[in-house]
């Protein structure tokens, strides 16, 4: 879709009149992302799509993804920057040491696990990290409380406590 390609280029602040070979790698990457989403292919595979992008370009990419994806599209993102895509995910696969450690929908994760910030460490905590504001913990979601999974905290928990996390989904 040419109109969408133009819109994506504008969103990512790419000059359409400049030759791709004359711009920086970052600008080339943004142009390729703009093109990929304008194609409306059923599958898009991205490896570290936000590496090398500044904050405004990352935000623009999220807007493009939100606008471009639908129920007929699958977007597979390999990234170490999970927070860049937290609000766009509906399924999560965590890999470690060549194995699939977690493969669940975000709905299932939030139904089974509660991500909570507390002053004291809850006894039932599956995984927790402490900072100046208290403990950020993953707990069993026994009451079905609505919450948003913290992907980075979950990633660390899956790597450090794989059996505990796995047991929450059995």
For the regions a protein language model found, what residue spans apply to each?
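C-terminal coupling/interaction segments
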Residues: 127-170
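Helix N-cap at the start of a conserved alpha-helix in ABC-type nucleotide-binding domains
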Residues: 55-57
């Amino acid at each position: 879709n040419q109109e969408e390609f133009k819109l994506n280029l504008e969103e990512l602040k790419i000059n359409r009149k400049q030759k791709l070979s004359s711009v920086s790698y970052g600008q080339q990457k943004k142009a390729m992302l703009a093109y990929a989403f304008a194609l409306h292919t059923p599958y898009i595979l991205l490896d570290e799509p936000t590496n090398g992008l500044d904050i405004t370009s990352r935000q623009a990419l999220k807007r493009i993804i939100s606008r471009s994806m639908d129920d007929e599209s699958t977007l597979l993102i390999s990234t170490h920057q999970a927070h860049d895509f937290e609000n766009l995910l509906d399924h999560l696969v965590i890999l470690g040491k060549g194995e699939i450690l977690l493969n669940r929908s975000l709905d299932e994760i939030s139904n089974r696990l509660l991500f909570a910030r507390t002053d004291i460490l809850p006894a039932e905590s599956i995984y927790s990290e402490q900072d100046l504001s208290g403990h950020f913990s993953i707990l069993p979601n026994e009451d079905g409380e609505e919450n948003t999974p913290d992907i980075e905290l979950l990633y660390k928990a899956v790597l450090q406590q794989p059996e505990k996390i796995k047991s929450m989904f059995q």
